[in-house]
Amino acid sequence: VQLSPLGFAACQSKNCTNRANITPQRGCSCLSCTNRAITTYFPMKWIVITSPDFVSGETLFIDRLFGHGLDLLHLRKPGSTIEACRELLRQIPERWHSRIVLHDHFPLTGEFLLHGVHLNRRCPHAPDGYMGSISCSCHSLEEVAKKKPTSDYVFLSPIFNSISKAGYEAAFSTAALQHAAEEGLIDAKVYALGGVSKEHIAQLKELSFGGAAFLGDVWRRMDDPTVDVYLDELRSLLS
């Protein structure tokens, strides 16, 4: 019996083109593919990116997000001063600092013992000697292939039509994402960004994304009296 790299018996179905591969063949009902499909699912990381502007009550809501099980907060305030970001961090309870990633003003990572930095056009390089988490954004599958090996994780966007940016539409077909997952390009180190909401989580798991990054879907609910129920649902679906 031929084995896949994970030790599963390779698919013996004549219609399965994925023989001996790690990723199960979609639509194939053979026991090998079914077993691999179950085994390769994993809890997804829950990421929230801050609103680009400073918002009243923001730090209280951030504390609330972490209380509901948020894995990482990406602090993104383009155009802000280091003093403004420092003050925001001071208002966030210290117990959450190790779960915060900066998009700007990287020296604050050492000052507050933060989780990591997110490279971007404004800040394309990590500080010299930096030993924390490094992530970056990708807008094509080619970028993912290039940047994933040197990153702890990467964002791929836009996966769905943006909630917060009018006219910012999905850039990838479902077929292209499925192929990238089957090839192992989309994996635990690739997080989906762009229009992500609760309704998309099951699909993102099917596509092997390791995490989901939320922006507009979460921040538009900041003053919703039922937001706690929604946040609990997100945490449960991602687990």
Spans of model-derived segments:
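Cysteine-centered motifs
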Residues: 11, 16, 28-33
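Active-site mouth loops of central-metabolism enzymes
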Residues: 44-57, 135-136
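Conserved, mostly hydrophobic/aromatic
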Residues: 48, 73, 109, 154, ...
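N-terminal active-site wall of soluble small-molecule enzyme domains
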Residues: 66, 70-130
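Alpha-helix-loop-beta-strand connector modules within alpha/beta enzyme cores
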Residues: 89-101, 133-140, 171-191, 234-239
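Catalytic cores of alpha/beta
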Residues: 102-115, 139-150, 183-186, 191, ...
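Glycine-rich phosphate-binding active-site loops on the catalytic face of alpha/beta enzymes
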Residues: 120-127, 155-167, 201-234
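Histidine/lysine/aspartate-rich catalytic loop segments that bind and position anionic ligands
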Residues: 134, 140-165
